[in-house]
């Protein structure tokens, strides 16, 4: 094997892109923070799915599972977008824990209405972070990442809506 081939194989993972080095670094950083938040939100949503209890068990259990599936589904898209623009992704649980902004909930019991409120708040925080990342992508003219983020914002807004409506208290007749 010649020397050039050996050197290329040792080179850092840097997918060719027309984005500048600063744009690639900043967008990859923003996406990795989002990826950490998405993993944290996924695990919290799944935890609440496993531990929900009470008269609305079935409805909340199913909703949390659907939302967790939707959240997990974007992890690969986020990570692959980082790679497409020449960055590297989070590598470990420890790396995720250092980057995540969505707090964990290690409580043994959480009231179902508190679960709804906490997940709603976490999804709203995710939306804020997504909008900030979108602004960065707009500044750097990364329309592909911005386009993906728009879909993720819409999905998170839908989750917030469902969590909000599930927590509303109707009158005694159910209306």
Please state what every model-predicted region is.
Residues 18-26, 41-66, 132-144:
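Helix-loop segments that flank and shape redox-cofactor active sites
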Residues 52, 56-95:
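Conserved alpha-helical segments that form or flank metal/cofactor-binding pockets of metalloenzymes
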Residues 1-17:
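Acidic, low-complexity proline/glycine-rich segments
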Residues 73, 147-173:
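Short, contiguous alpha-helical
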Residues 81, 94-151:
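Acidic/histidine-rich alpha-helical segments that form the ligand environment
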Residues 12-34, 112:
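Disorder-to-helix initiation segments
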Residues 52, 57, 69, 93-97, ...:
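Long, contiguous binding/interaction regions
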Residues 32, 36-39, 65, 69-76, ...:
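Generic structural signal for well-ordered, non-transmembrane alpha-helical segments
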